UniProtKB/Swiss-Prot annotation:
Domain of life the protein comes from: Eukaryota
Encoding gene, per UniProt annotation: pyroxd1
Note describing how the cofactor binds: Binds 1 FAD per subunit.
Keywords, sorted A to Z: FAD, Flavoprotein, NADP, Oxidoreductase
GO molecular function: oxidoreductase activity
Lineage, broadest ranks: Eukaryota, Amoebozoa, Evosea, Eumycetozoa, Dictyostelia
One Pfam family cited in the UniProt record for this chain: Rubredoxin_C
Stated name of the protein: Pyridine nucleotide-disulfide oxidoreductase domain-containing protein 1
EC numbers for this chain: 1.8.1.-
Organism from which the protein derives: Dictyostelium discoideum
Top-level class of the enzyme under EC nomenclature: oxidoreductase
Required cofactor(s): FAD
């Protein structure tokens, strides 16, 4: 029996999933993970929600734990210098490693808007710890970007003024249209107001109990009032317990500012409106240090805009494209990521033969339907790769943790299949993943404390529709209809039908519709006769289409 050597570059979700999945399929083969960090990201507590949709928790683990759990996996902490394609060798600062198969899962890196010691990007544990440390003394920060990380930060950072610069006309444009974004915006206001009122009730009860000689702690009082609040406000969303979905990294950290600043603002009511100053349709133009000679002139020019009347001596100032100037403690760049393929670009430029790994225009590694690159025996998965082979109308690539896990598992299956091709082992190899998982886009996550399920073309991707100006019940080109229903503070449901068939759905809150809508998209049942009634809450649709 031939023993193959698989080398995996990268210790993120895609890389570790690929390595562990291949180890399961080929326990006698050798697997080596080349990681620049001793901390690897692993997936635990996987729960199947439906055929395609699943939830899981992401944990960070020491590489020694991975080696202990998988005897045929070894982890080398190193920096990859280059790949010798002709001789199948990966060159690193810790030596050279020969491979039979190579899986490049080097992920992506933050797309920083500017270079500055006062600007950080959020990508790994180190940057999260850096953020937490900086926030401990921060009074005001600037967040640039409108994607998932920006939304999570806006929700989690408390008692700190936030200037939020977004290039779009509404929040969350990377995931949501204007209607869904408005639902989240208004729901957060309602919930924040309700939470503030509950704290005031607790405070009043504590004062009264002190007079009566009885004192319960705050947790006991909140628990005591939980039934009252739930009866008086049925639309209040109640966060469900259970496993965190996607990269719920923020749940492990307490993002609060200094005690002194909290004390100074103890009586100030912070909600989404007052705490966050959203600068719509803007981008970061310039960054000035407080010693910059150009700063004084900018302050003079902006005496009626931004921070013109602000007497605080800030370490850094930000000028936005609308001319507004804001002082802050630091800046968070949350403008997405770019494929981490720098080493391959260098290799391709220095390669004198025709064996080069083809990259897309954005620098991602192009793979075929077997996750194979343009070079034999080299595969790729996760944020660093570009999938252009899926023929499904309702699947598209998005750089998400859920897709990184799927791609890592499927890549391991493809490599294992190739390694036993035309051998006696071919018929005995397990099949843990197929390309069926690329038939439907499905992602579960949370935003602003709400469970969010995205299915198919949930935001009409690729349909050339302007949802921000679209009448939800008006018929569009290609017989496309969009229906929505919402209960502010509780749930939002959107469905997109093309020629009477469901092709996408967005579910926010506890709707219990994810499995039903997934089946309707996959089975392409004609729903044209139902119209908007498909979202009628009085109809038990999950039973009707069971």
């Amino acid at each position: 029996m031939t023993i193959n050597q698989l080398i995996v570059i990268g210790g993120g979700i895609a890389g570790l999933t690929c390595a562990e999945s291949y180890s399961h399929l080929k326990p006698n083969d050798k697997v080596t993970i080349l990681s620049c960090s001793p901390i690897l990201k692993t997936v635990c507590n996987v729960q199947k929600i439906s055929k395609v949709l699943e939830s899981f928790e992401v944990f960070e683990t020491q590489f020694t734990d991975i080696e202990f759990k998988n005897p045929n996996i070894s982890v080398i902490i190193c920096d990859v210098d280059s790949i010798d394609i002709n001789n199948r060798i990966v060159k690193t600062d810790k030596g050279n490693f020969k491979y039979d198969y190579l899986s490049i899962c080097s992920g992506a890196k933050p797309n920083l808007v500017k270079e500055s010691p006062y600007l950080i990007g959020i990508r790994d544990t180190e940057t999260i710890v850096d953020l937490k440390n900086r926030l401990s003394n921060a009074k005001r920060i600037v967040i640039v970007g409108n994607g998932g990380i920006a939304l999570e930060l806006i929700h989690e950072i408390k008692n700190c003024q936030i200037i939020w610069s977004i290039k779009d006309k509404h929040i969350g444009n990377a995931f949501f249209d204007k209607d869904a974004a408005d639902f989240l915006f208004r729901s957060k206001q309602i919930i924040d107001d309700d939470n503030h009122d509950k704290k005031n009730v607790v405070k009043e009860q504590q004062q009264q109990q002190q007079k009566d000689g009885i004192l319960l702690n705050e947790d006991e009082l909140i628990a005591k009032n939980q039934n009252i609040s739930s009866q008086s406000n049925s639309s209040l969303y109640k966060s469900e317990s259970g496993s965190a979905l996607g990269p719920q990294w923020y749940s492990k950290y307490n993002f609060k500012t200094t005690d002194q600043y909290n004390k100074n603002n103890q009586e100030k009511k912070y909600n989404f409106n007052e705490n966050v100053n959203i600068q719509y349709s803007t981008f970061l133009d310039e960054i000035y240090s407080n010693h910059d000679k150009k700063l004084n002139q900018e302050i003079i020019n902006n005496n009626n805009n931004g921070d013109g009347d602000d007497k605080e001596d800030w370490p850094i100032y930000v000028k936005l494209s609308n001319g507004n100037l804001f002082g802050c403690n630091f800046i968070i760049s949350a403008t997405g990521v770019i494929p981490n393929s720098t080493i391959l670009t260098k290799d391709n430029n220095n390669n004198n033969n025709n064996k080069i790994i083809k990259l897309s225009n954005e620098g991602a590694i192009i793979v075929d339907e077997q996750m194979k690159t343009s070079v034999d025996r080299i595969y790729s998965a996760g944020d660093v790769c570009s999938i252009e082979w899926s023929e499904s109308e309702v699947w598209f690539q998005m750089r998400l943790w859920s897709q990184a896990r799927t791609q890592g598992r499927y890549t391991a299956q493809c490599i294992a299949n190739e390694s036993v091709k035309n051998t006696p082992q071919q018929d005995n190899l397990d099949q843990i993943c197929t390309n069926f998982e690329f038939e439907l886009f499905a992602h579960a996550t949370k935003f602003f404390g709400f469970k969010v399920i995205m299915l198919g073309l949930y935001n009409a991707q690729g349909l050339n529709l302007n949802l921000d100006n679209n009448n939800q019940n008006e018929e569009n080109q290609d017989n496309i209809k969009i229906y929505t229903r919402e209960i502010i503070g509780e749930q939002y449901v959107k469905v997109i039908l093309k020629n009477g068939r469901l092709i996408g759905s967005l579910l926010i809150g506890d709707t219990d519709l994810e499995e039903t809508f997934e089946n309707l998209i996959l089975n392409q049942i004609d729903l044209s006769g139902y119209g908007a009634e498909i979202l009628n809450p009085e109809i038990d649709i999950e039973d009707y289409f069971d």
